[in-house]
């Protein structure tokens, strides 16, 4: 069997910390040169760049605003520096907690622009390049378990992630003929700055409502992304893979809750 081999050139958005940094580092360990983006944390992006270069790979850095209609230009810019593009990891995103009744249109649009519009524009630019080169490729979208199940106080976030999950399937159908796979990774609660935790918290925080009893570690997300980016995943496309410690299995245990405090934001 001959498996198409895409270029070992990857772009990871939002790689200045957390899951993005872990993914960039693991891809570098797997032999990829990496382009990374950041929004405001330039120092964090510099640390990620140093970590990639310590692994003997090239790394280029660019600031990116996912709410801009021109955000796809960043993908083109990094791809030009890399000399091509074989893998895009749409990792960057944002979150917001609050009642839907209080959600302003501006905040709603900001959430959808960051978590859905921006990833679409990045994927579109990446796919065009992959089609043009004719060597296939991989697109991995980081969604959330809330692509699949709702969360109180996160209407805009859940809507955007659900949309990104459906976009993953639509792109997978359209791009399969070009040997481009498109998949999603749906993390549960992961110990990152976005969730107010440090990486070691993954193994010292207690989570009774999760079958594993703890949050996830960024390396556990990066490992799945790296698999999907590899030739070993060449027959897997259009799927969303929850990496949540079994959290989504717990729905039937809602009757075990002692009170209705979960309703309060």
Feature-to-residue mapping (PLM):
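Substrate-binding pocket helix/loop in short-chain dehydrogenase/reductase
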Residues: 99-100, 107-112, 206
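Active-site helix of classical SDR
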Residues: 123, 160, 168
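Alpha-helical segment proximal to the catalytic Tyr-Lys
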Residues: 128, 173-174, 234
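Residue(s) in the substrate-gating loop at a strand-loop-helix junction
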Residues: 144
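Short C-terminal tail/terminal secondary-structure segment
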Residues: 149, 237-265
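Short, small/polar-rich loop/turn modules that mediate ligand/substrate recognition or access, typified
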Residues: 176, 181, 236-238
């Amino acid at each position: 069997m001959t498996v198409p081999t895409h270029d070992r050139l990857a772009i990871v958005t939002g790689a200045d910390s957390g899951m993005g940094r872990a993914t960039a580092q693991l891809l570098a360990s797997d032999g990829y040169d990496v382009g990374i983006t950041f929004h405001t944390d330039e120092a964090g992006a510099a640390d990620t760049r140093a970590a990639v270069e310590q692994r003997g790979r090239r790394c280029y850095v660019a600031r990116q605003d996912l709410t801009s209609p021109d955000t796809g230009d960043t993908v083109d810019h990094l791809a030009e520096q890399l000399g091509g593009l074989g893998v895009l990891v749409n990792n960057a995103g944002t979150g917001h907690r609050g009642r839907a009744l209080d959600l302003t249109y501006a905040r709603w649009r900001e959430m959808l622009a960051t978590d859905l519009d921006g990833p679409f524009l990045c994927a579109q630019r990446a796919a065009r390049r992959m089609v043009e080169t004719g060597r296939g490729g991989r697109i991995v979208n980081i969604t959330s378990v809330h692509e699949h199940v709702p969360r109180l106080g996160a209407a805009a976030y859940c809507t955007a992630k659900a949309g990104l999950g459906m976009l993953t399937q639509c792109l997978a159908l359209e791009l399969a003929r070009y040997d481009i796979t498109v998949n999603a990774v749906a993390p549960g609660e992961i110990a990152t700055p976005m969730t107010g935790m440090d990486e070691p918290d993954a193994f010292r925080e207690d989570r009774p409502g999760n079958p594993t009893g703890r949050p996830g570690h960024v390396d556990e997300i990066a490992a799945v992304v790296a698999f999907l980016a590899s030739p070993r995943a060449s027959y897997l496309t259009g799927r969303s893979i929850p990496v949540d410690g079994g959290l989504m299995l717990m729905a039937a245990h809602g009757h075990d809750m002692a009170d209705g405090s979960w309703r309060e934001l």
